[in-house]
């Protein structure tokens, strides 16, 4: 999927795509709220900063999906 395609998705479609990347519902919601991304670098920076802002419970939720 291109960045442009990701940015053009509806909120629910984008959340489904983010769920494929991470099982934390908090991470998924925050990623969706940070759209649109202006570059791939920006997307990865947001993904990383959101991940490290999550609670231990959010991390546990993500790890349960592995």
PLM feature spans:
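Aromatic-anchored, charged helix-turn/loop surface patch used as a conserved interaction hotspot
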Residues: 1-10, 16, 21, 26-66
């Amino acid at each position: 999927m291109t960045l442009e395609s990701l940015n053009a998705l509806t909120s629910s479609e984008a959340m489904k795509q983010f769920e494929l990347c991470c099982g934390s519902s908090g991470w998924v919601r925050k990623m969706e709220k940070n759209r649109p991304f202006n570059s791939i670098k920006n997307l990865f920076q947001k993904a990383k900063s959101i991940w490290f802002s999550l609670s231990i419970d959010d991390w546990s939720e993500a790890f349960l999906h592995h």
